[in-house]
Amino acid sequence: MDGAGSLTRSFFRSLRPQADLKAAAIGAVVLLREWVQDKRRERLHAARAAAKDKIKAKAVVEREPPPRVVALVERYLPRRVGISMTVLLLIGSCGFGIVKGGHLQDFVTAISDARNAMANSAGFRITSVVINGRKQLTQDEILAIGGVSGRSSLLFLDADAVRDKLKANPWIADATVLKLYPGQLMIELTERKAFALWQEAGRLSVIADDGAVLEPYVSRRFLSLPLVVGKGADTQARDFLALLARYPQVNSITKAAIFVGERRWNLRLKDGLDIRLPEQDVGNALAMLSRLDKEDKLFSRDIVAVDMRLPDRLVVQLSEDAAKAREEQFKDKKKKKAGDAA
């Protein structure tokens, strides 16, 4: 038993060095393989990095140099200034597009509406409007003329601009605009009065005493106004109609005053009779007409025209029937004279 056991222990001792050598060999192989793989990875990484550097270098080489102006701007212009200029350029482009496209008024209106909306929200809404001196125009018409709407705020309302707009209307001679905070607007008006109707080139207009055209004649409420006709009659009407009013015998039956050649006046009476007044001394001519009508019933006679243009005579034109009757009367007189002579 002791001999067999000794033999076995001797056998296993002889095998240990062989196992250690084999394990060492396997470890060396593994380390070698890892070292080779690491080298391969390093070479691959280096190759990729070289390729990237080559591409970058190629891109840098192939890039065209910037223009001189751009280079100077990039070199000397601060970065923030460049950004500001870019923003200004964009704003300018937008503004040019708005103006070119015809949207400027819409843009201004939108800005004004937004501003007024904020002011109205803050308590500056126009809640009361007082208008004094209004006769011909309604309150809505006056506010529309002045550019005051329901969106307007008292805070941003330009009183001078409203006044100028009101005075631009022919009916308004003068205006005063007051803003009473927080929400009252007061307007004092001096209106022109309708003075006469003026007919020229087929158009009929209502005019003031200074000749300003107030509006086209569309309302019959002005039918009672005196009528003047002809070029220049609008500015000369005040003086002539004032003179005519001094002779009610003629004025009361006058239908229209016609300004002829911008020099003198004709009268068209209501029965169609034409009175041709002289260029000078019109007052004496009107006085003569009044006297002849009182004494001789001139305006009741069968005549169609009275010509007073000549200073030393008055010419009367008979109607066609009156002229024929007068001609027959002359013929009868001639026959009677011829019979008496025989």
Swiss-Prot record:
This is Cell division protein FtsQ. The gene is ftsQ. Residues 1-80 are cytoplasmic. InterPro entries: Cell_div_FtsQ/DivIB_C, FtsQ, FtsQ_C_sf, POTRA, POTRA_FtsQ_type. The keyword Magnesium does not apply. Belongs to the FtsQ/DivIB family. FtsQ subfamily. GO terms for biological process: division septum assembly; FtsZ-dependent cytokinesis. HAMAP family: FtsQ_subfam. It is a single-pass type II membrane protein.
